[in-house]
């Protein structure tokens, strides 16, 4: 039996004390949250025709302010401090969490530009989600020019969830963050303007499978609670080295690690928990896909790193083999399946799965280099992938204006739209990890960390998988630049200032991080103190932080 | 043979102390800037581009003259001045500065290049007047002048190599300037490929020098050659010679020069007669201390020079294309210089002196040939010329002066410098000296014959013109440079050779002349008289054969020597048989292996990955239930792995 003798101090029972919150340190989260709440009020009280401008301004300003506040807090964090905990030790402010939040906010801003883009007054979102696809009601809404500006508060809540996901300091807060992040995304996926049934199917699938994975996650938390008697990462960590509450409780921990791992691996989308990704990425409105492929991935890996490096940082040997198996499966299976994809969004989805596998090798490394490598990789991949999806929004079918996903239509695009094709070519080269792009530095960093941690076979698989992925990336480049334009050639929209900014941001980040990665690796990505760097995983004492100082 | 150089001549260089010399890099920068403006400026510069190019070349020449003035103001032993421009490469101990060496030898070349170069720039305004790509042509000419100056002004082998490749590029671009003509495109490619062979030799020799001495700067290398092994120096010398052979069209890398005549005639005059093709001679003279440490290499240099001297002359005797006949002559004359350079210190000054006068008279001859072609609708076959002396008096006169100079009429430029080489060859002593000497004397007779043949076929005899030919004298912009070059062809030799003016000027670099200047000896030595007699015989034989009205318009069959000479002594056949066809076979074999062997494996892997992909994507059914099942299966795997590894 599991003894339910809960320890006296960690009981999160009703207190008579007013919670002592440090609003300043929580401000990046609060600003985004407030923007979401105000957005809901705007929906309720502001006339429909004025909502678009108010909502876009509100969302972008909020994300921008939160980004600046994040930067300010990085500067304000004392140099000798590993990090602080807030709000009854449920939220942690340390350099990695601030880094992840900053990256998430920047990527959210880039995605917001895509979300706000309108063509002839049409956004990527349906006018009235409640209308049955193909019905008279839908047509009426289309003719009336209805818009779903609820998209913006939903995005704000999703971003809030992503931020909190990387900053949670116990499993319950993390679970709440997971749900805050996921629920708006489920909705957003079903709001595509064109191919609505497809979009709704994607949303439903995402919701069902997401709920399924949340159940695993919650079940795992229960198991770990049974083992450690606490849900705080620090307490779980301590229990891992001291042996837990009861004798012979190790199976509880192991099942807990496995189940929490399943929840995490679902969110990052590794094989065999990846099936949702192609369907959802393809069905969702492309700006939302961009947000999921960049922001959600960063948040999920941020949370995963915290769980496995901090909470399970004393039980590395227990979870490492499991992640080995998943990483190998992911890198091999996803790369092979991607070879025969014919739709650009599905291809990018599988690409995302393979990249999750590569980043997983850094998690397996369980050392400081793995942490910094994964951080660089996530930032680099995030900007590249946002740029790639931004380009997808520009290539449309000539007849109905829907996005032209079929790759055969992309043939010869290098001649008709050289800049667009060159940008996408650059992004694809970065995905393939070609030198002078950010992708190369990222791959190098995570593989180097994995080799240092003795995971050389994993890296060999990774390099072979990279070779396979390079095949299909380069094939698209060849198709664009060296093939005759297809008969059903797509109509390429001229990028507006919003989409253009996103593409430009992607190109700039991909080149900058590829050619001059030094400054970013030295100054932007938080570095553990030199003397403790080797011991981060093994000798982690100040478990509130990813870095011991 | 004593080394006069290694001991003291090369020992000291001084840094430039301000003034004109410190800005010696301007000589290179000005034409380079001109080329950049013309190439990047595009059509906007069409109207005035050629004048800009001329201004660039002329100002470079002026700067060279000013530099010479300042150099002459110094004591002879202080005339080696290093001008540091910037650090070019620094990798570990590999440290190369882009520095220039201003000394008598390099300044002699700089003056020749910029002086003759400027004249040919001016001439080209008229010659290329109707070419729509004239601006591009002038850009390339400027580029060539800049690269050639880099070559001769470099103070180390790495920078020299930079210029070496630069002139190769300019030469390639200019030979193929009329790329719409397949023959021009092929000739450009051929020149480029053959030059690559020579370039490899130069490059490997530079590598050897670096590994041996740790530096590629001239002076430190030359100071330490005595310490290195003779075998190594022989290897370096032979490799340098290979490079020189490529650039200077010496045997066995001579085959490109005749084809290079497909380029516009000013190019033939500047690059393929006066300057670039003499770079090999410059390389050998500049690397003198290395060759002096390797007598075997020196001997090979003289043999190559002698063989090319004769081969070029024989080819020149049989070619009906006026430019190709002159190209054969160029080969032959450079053979003279190479031979002299191979003799060591006693030959260096003679080689350089002949190089300078040859630069003038051969450039003048080519410009004259260009003037004739210009007048005859680009006809190059001399059998279609004849009797042009009356319609083109200026061209006839200037060409005539050049002709008299090259065949060695006493007191004209060619005589002074060729006599120097003949004398040096006999002076080198021994059986080798005798053989080389008689080769140079025989060459003088052959020169007289083939040059007279050109002269008589073109300007004398009956008119054998094509029906639509309407020859006329060229405009002043073309004839003035020809006149200036003719004056040089007549008088420059005396200026340079009397009292050994040039030799004494060069003495700090190549060693002092072996004996006093003695005009009487020059006129009365038996070898000199023999050369004179052979010259008269050659002219007379040519007069009998070609200065009459019996010259057929189509070439007669000829005996086997004539046929062989027309075929350029089968140089192309040898290249094709030995290198081209086996190379093509190798290429085909490699392609076949790549197609069937390598590609087979690669496509096999790709095919199996694709097949695996087709199977695996079946798991992506689209049904949420099967995805959930997959997840459940995955969760089971994760749990079992975790438990199994830790509890088993």
Curated annotation (Swiss-Prot), chain A:
User: What keywords were assigned to this record?
Assistant: Cell membrane, Membrane, NAD, Quinone, Translocase, Transmembrane, Transmembrane helix, Transport
Question: Which EC number(s) are documented for this chain?
Answer: 7.1.1.-
Q: What is its main location?
A: membrane
User: So what does this thing catalyse?
Assistant: a quinone + NADH + 5 H(+)(in) = a quinol + NAD(+) + 4 H(+)(out)
**Has UniProt tagged this entry with the keyword Transmembrane?**
yes
Q: How does it sit in the membrane?
A: Multi-pass membrane protein
As given in the record, the signal peptide range reads: none
Q: Does the keyword Magnesium apply?
A: no
Q: GO terms for biological process?
A: ATP synthesis coupled electron transport
The places in or outside the cell where this protein is found are:
Cell membrane
Matching entries from Pfam families are given as: Proton_antipo_M
List the Gene Ontology MF annotations in alphabetical order: NADH dehydrogenase (ubiquinone) activity; NADH:ubiquinone reductase (non-electrogenic) activity; quinone binding
Which parts pass through the membrane?
26-46, 57-77, 96-116, 148-168, 171-191, 206-226, 253-273, 297-317, 321-341, 347-367, 375-395, 421-441, 466-486, 496-516
Provide one Gene Ontology cellular component: plasma membrane
- Record's subunit section: NDH-1 is composed of 14 different subunits. Subunits NuoA, H, J, K, L, M, N constitute the membrane sector of the complex.
Query: What does it do?
Result: NDH-1 shuttles electrons from NADH, via FMN and iron-sulfur (Fe-S) centers, to quinones in the respiratory chain. The immediate electron acceptor for the enzyme in this species is believed to be a menaquinone. Couples the redox reaction to proton translocation (for every two electrons transferred, four hydrogen ions are translocated across the cytoplasmic membrane), and thus conserves the redox energy in a proton gradient.
The family assignment reads:
Belongs to the complex I subunit 2 family.
Q: What is this protein called?
A: NADH-quinone oxidoreductase subunit N
Q: Which organism is it from?
A: Thermobifida fusca (strain YX)
């Amino acid at each position: 039996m599991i003894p339910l003798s809960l320890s006296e101090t960690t009981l999160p029972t009703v207190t008579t004390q007013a919670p002592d919150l440090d609003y300043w340190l929580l401000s990046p989260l609060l600003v985004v949250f407030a923007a979401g709440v105000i957005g809901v009020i705007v929906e309720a009280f502001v006339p429909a025709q004025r909502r678009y401008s108010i909502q876009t301004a509100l969302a972008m300003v909020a994300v921008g302010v939160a980004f600046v506040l994040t930067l300010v807090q990085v500067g304000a964090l004392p140099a000798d401090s590993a990090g602080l905990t807030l709000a009854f030790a449920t939220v942690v402010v340390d350099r990695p969490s601030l880094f992840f939040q900053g990256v998430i906010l920047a990527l959210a801003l880039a995605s917001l530009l895509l979300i706000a883009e309108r063509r002839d007054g049409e956004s990527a979102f349906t006018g009235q989600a409640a209308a049955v696809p193909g019905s008279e009601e839908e047509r009426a809404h289309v003719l009336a020019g209805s818009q779903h500006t609820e998209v913006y508060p939903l995005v704000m809540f999703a971003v809030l969830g992503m931020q909190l996901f990387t900053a949670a300091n116990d499993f319950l807060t993390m679970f709440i963050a997971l749900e805050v992040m996921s629920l708006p995304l489920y909705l957003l996926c079903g709001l595509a303007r064109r191919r609505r049934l497809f979009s709704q199917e994607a949303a439903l699938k995402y919701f069902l499978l997401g709920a399924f994975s949340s159940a695993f996650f919650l079940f795992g938390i229960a198991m770990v609670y049974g083992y450690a008697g606490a849900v705080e990462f620090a307490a779980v960590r301590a229990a891992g080295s001291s042996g837990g509450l009861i004798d012979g409780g190790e199976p509880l921990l192991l099942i807990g690690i496995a189940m929490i791992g399943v929840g995490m691996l679902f969110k990052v989308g590794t094989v065999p928990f990846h099936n949702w990704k192609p369907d959802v990425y393809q069905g969702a409105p492309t700006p939302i896909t961009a947000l999921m492929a960049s922001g959600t991935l960063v948040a999920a890996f941020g949370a995963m790193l915290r769980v496995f490096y901090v909470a399970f940082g004393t039980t590395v040997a227990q979870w490492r083999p499991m992640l080995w198996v998943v990483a190998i499966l992911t890198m091999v299976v996803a790369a092979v399946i991607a070879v025969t994809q014919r739709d650009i969004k599905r291809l990018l989805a599988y690409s995302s799965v393979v990249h999750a596998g590569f980043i997983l090798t850094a998690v397996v490394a369980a050392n400081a280099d793995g942490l910094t490598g994964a951080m660089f990789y996530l930032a680099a991949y995030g900007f590249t992938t946002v740029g790639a999806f931004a380009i997808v929004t520009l290539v449309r079918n000539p007849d109905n204006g829907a996005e032209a996903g079929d790759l055969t239509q992309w043939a010869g695009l290098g001649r008709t739209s050289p800049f667009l094709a060159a940008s996408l070519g650059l992004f694809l080269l970065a995905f393939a990890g070609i030198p002078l792009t950010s992708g190369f530095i990222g791959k190098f960093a995570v593989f180097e960390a994995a080799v240092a941690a003795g995971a050389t076979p994993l890296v060999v698989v990774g390099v072979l998988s990279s070779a396979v992925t390079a095949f299909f990336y380069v094939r698209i480049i060849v198709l664009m630049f060296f093939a005759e334009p297809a008969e059903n050639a797509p109509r390429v929209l001229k990028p507006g200032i919003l989409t253009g900014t996103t593409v430009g941001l992607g190109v700039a980040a991909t080149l900058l991080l590829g050619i001059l990665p030094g400054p970013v690796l030295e100054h932007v990505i938080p570095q553990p103190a030199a003397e403790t760097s080797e011991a981060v995983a093994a000798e982690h004492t100040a478990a509130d932080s990813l870095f011991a100082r | 043979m004593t080394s006069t150089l290694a001991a003291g001549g090369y020992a000291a260089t001084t840094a430039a102390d301000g003034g004109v010399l410190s800005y010696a890099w301007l000589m290179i920068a000005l034409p380079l800037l001109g080329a950049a403006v013309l190439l990047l400026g595009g059509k906007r510069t069409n109207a005035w581009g050629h004048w800009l190019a001329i201004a660039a070349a002329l100002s470079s020449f002026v700067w060279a003259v000013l530099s010479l003035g300042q150099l002459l103001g110094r004591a002879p032993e202080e005339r080696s001045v290093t001008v540091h421009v910037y650090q070019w490469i620094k990798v570990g101990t590999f440290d190369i500065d882009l520095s220039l060496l201003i000394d008598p030898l390099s300044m002699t070349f700089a003056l020749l290049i910029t002086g003759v170069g400027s004249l040919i720039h001016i001439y080209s305004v008229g010659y290329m007047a109707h070419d729509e790509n004239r601006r591009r042509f002038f850009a390339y000419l400027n580029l060539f002048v800049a690269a050639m100056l880099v070559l001769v002004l470099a103070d180390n082998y790495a920078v020299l190599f930079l210029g070496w490749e630069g002139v190769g590029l300019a030469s390639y671009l200019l030979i193929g300037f009329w790329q719409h003509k397949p023959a021009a495109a092929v000739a450009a490619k051929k020149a480029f490929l053959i030059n690559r062979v020579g370039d490899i030799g130069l490059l490997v020799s530079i590598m050897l020098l670096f590994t041996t001495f740790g530096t590629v700067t001239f002076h430190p290398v030359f100071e330490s050659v005595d310490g290195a092994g003779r075998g190594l120096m022989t290897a370096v010398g032979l490799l340098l010679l290979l490079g020189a052979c490529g650039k200077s069209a010496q045997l066995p890398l001579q085959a490109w020069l005749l084809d290079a005549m497909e380029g516009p005639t000013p190019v033939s005059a500047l690059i393929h007669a006066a300057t670039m093709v003499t770079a090999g001679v410059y390389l050998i003279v500049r690397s003198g201390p290395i060759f002096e440490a390797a007598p075997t290499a020196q001997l090979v240099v003289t043999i190559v020079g002698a063989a090319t001297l004769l081969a070029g002359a024989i080819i020149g005797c049989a070619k009906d294309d006026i430019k190709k006949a002159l190209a054969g002559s160029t080969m032959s004359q450079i053979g003279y210089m190479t031979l002299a350079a191979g003799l060591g210190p006693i030959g260096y000054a003679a080689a350089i002196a002949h190089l300078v006068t040859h630069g003038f008279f051969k450039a003048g001859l080519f410009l004259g040939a260009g003037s004739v072609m210009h007048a005859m609708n680009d006809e190059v076959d001399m059998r279609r010329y004849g009797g042009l002396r009356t319609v083109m008096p200026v061209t006839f006169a200037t060409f005539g002066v050049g002709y008299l100079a090259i065949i060695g009429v006493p007191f004209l430029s060619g005589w002074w410098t060729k006599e120097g080489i003949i004398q040096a060859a006999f002076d080198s002593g021994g059986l080798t000296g005798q053989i080389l000497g008689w080769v140079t004397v025989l060459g003088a007779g052959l020169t007289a014959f083939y040059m007279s043949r050109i002269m008589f076929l073109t300007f004398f005899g009956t008119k054998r013109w094509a029906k639509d030919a309407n020859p006329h004298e060229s405009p002043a912009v073309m004839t003035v440079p020809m006149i200036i070059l003719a004056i040089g062809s007549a008088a420059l030799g005396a200026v340079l050779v009397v009292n050994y003016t040039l030799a004494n000027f060069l003495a700090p670099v190549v060693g002092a002349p072996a004996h006093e200047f003695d005009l009487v000896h020059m006129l009365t030595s038996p070898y000199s008289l023999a050369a004179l007699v052979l010259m008269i015989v050659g002219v007379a034989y040519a007069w009998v054969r070609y200065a009459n009205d019996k010259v057929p318009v189509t070439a007669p069959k000829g005996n086997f020597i004539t046929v062989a000479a027309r075929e350029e002594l089968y140089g192309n056949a040898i290249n094709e048989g030995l290198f081209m066809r086996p190379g093509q076979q190798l290429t085909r074999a490699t392609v076949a292996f790549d197609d069937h062997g390598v590609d087979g494996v690669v496509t096999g892997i790709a095919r199996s990955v694709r097949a695996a992909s087709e199977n695996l994507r079946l798991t992506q059914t689209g049904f949420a239930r099967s995805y959930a099942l997959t997840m459940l299966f995955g969760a089971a795997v994760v749990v079992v792995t975790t438990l199994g590894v830790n509890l088993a």
